[in-house]
Amino acid sequence: MGLIVDTSIIIALERGKISTKAWSNYDQAYINPIVLTELLIGIDRVKDENKRGQCLTFIEYVKSLFTLLPFGIEEAYVYAKIIDNLYKERITIGVHDLLIAATAITYNYPILTLNTKDFKRIPELEVLTVPLKD
């Protein structure tokens, strides 16, 4: 069974707060283009060239760890359905999180995140988390 990994987990990995063992019980761990985009946005904010180089190296490492799932037509339909359902309930969640959730729901994979507060409000989404190291 697969697993979608959220950006919060990857940031915790970069900071040494979790290890890759966090998803080792799953056959395959995936990210979607939105997770990659969020990481790239962070790089654009880094002004120090050495730090920027380290960030780019880390992103290459992330790309080697995970399979990148596409965000296509089916995911777009699921995304629209999620937004409609949340709108009816007057629930607001960030667009990026909803796009990541749509990918997880489309593939029927749980999502591994540290942002359980938002993701648990999305129906049909199985949300998993891990404890952080000190």
Swiss-Prot record:
Any one GO molecular-function label of the UniProt entry: metal ion binding
Enzyme class: hydrolase
Cofactor(s) essential for the protein: Mg(2+)
Any coiled-coil regions, as ranges: none
Keyword Hydrolase (UniProt): yes
InterPro entries: PIN-like_dom_sf (IPR029060), PIN_dom (IPR002716), Type_II_TA_system_RNase (IPR050556)
Binding site for Mg(2+): D6
Residue ranges of domain PINc in the record: 4-124
PANTHER family linked: RIBONUCLEASE VAPC2
Stated family: Belongs to the PINc/VapC protein family.
Name of the protein in question: Ribonuclease VapC
The organism of origin for this protein: Rickettsia bellii (strain RML369-C)
Gene field: vapC
